[in-house]
């Protein structure tokens, strides 16, 4: 990709991100689960927007998981366990401007399958 195409791709993602964040708000009972995917790894965190603090997080890089759908499902299982330890059963899913496809969708489905209501 040339520089102009990369700039446009990032600008479109930033616009989607702002549009989504204006509608989502997490609190202590129903935190916002924000995901980030790089070219190699996948990260997620549960955020209480009222207190502006992170409740729990998961880092695929430290656990040796790559940015694949299979690894996203495994991370979803582990993250669901972390959320249940914190006493959280319902969350607001913030896809962070990414399209709901591939690893972003696989992670969300894995959370649902493990008892977290999105």
Curated annotation (Swiss-Prot):
InterPro entries: Ribosomal_uL18_bac-type, Ribosomal_uL18_bac/euk. Belongs to the universal ribosomal protein uL18 family. Part of the 50S ribosomal subunit; part of the 5S rRNA/L5/L18/L25 subcomplex. Contacts the 5S and 23S rRNAs. One of its GO terms (biological process) is translation. This is one of the proteins that bind and probably mediate the attachment of the 5S RNA into the large ribosomal subunit, where it forms part of the central protuberance. Signal peptide: none annotated. SUPFAM superfamilies: Translational machinery components. GO terms for molecular function: 5S rRNA binding; structural constituent of ribosome. Keywords: Ribonucleoprotein, Ribosomal protein, RNA-binding, rRNA-binding. It holds the Pfam family Ribosomal_L18p. It comes from the Bacteria. This is Large ribosomal subunit protein uL18. One of its GO terms (cellular component) is cytosolic large ribosomal subunit. Gene3D superfamilies: 3.30.420.100.
